[in-house]
Amino acid sequence: MHVLGRLMMGGVLMLVGAGSALAQGTPPPANPAAPPAQASPSTYSSSEIVVAGHRFFGAISRDLAQLVERAVSRWGQPNGYILGQEGGGAFVVGLRYGDGTLYTKNAGDRRVFWEGPSIGFDYGGDGARTMMLVYNLPRTEAIYRRFAGVDGSAYVIGGLDMTALTDSNIVVVPIRSGVGLRLGANIGYLKFTERATWNPF
């Protein structure tokens, strides 16, 4: 179901060294030094996210690395991400609809839809490509819930903006591109569903 159609029908979303040599020529401990920190088998490194984002956003992705590093420095390395598109617009009260695919390393991929009201000044009826970083997701179906937070321009760099939403220790960080005049942060939520729906509540 096309995002713009849903929007219209709805009325117009983170080297430990091993040790010093012992005194008088005693051999060092047998335990080897730990390797440098890197992504675990189930999480994505910053470089993996940036590469996926460059392919997705294209020419406007020059500022993506800065936003990804900001997100990783605060929440660590995500164990999933969503690529999709959305539309929305608000002047005091508005709606947001989107659809895309949730990607994970070891739990498969899953189609997702999202919708939700926004309350505040986020004016412009924007249409946006959206990448969402997903943290602490225990299983793919756990994405289907409401995530509340500050759904607006928490960080804006160039043609991209980043926000954050959370529920039950799961954090979703949307990174959006698109058109529309954003006049400030608005408060709302995004509800992820298995199927497209007109109802954002």
State where each predicted segment sits.
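Small-residue-enriched, tightly packed secondary-structure blocks
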Residues: P28-F201
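Sec/Tat signal peptide C-region and signal peptidase I cleavage site
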Residues: G19-A23
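Bacterial N-terminal signal peptides that target proteins for export
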Residues: M1-M14
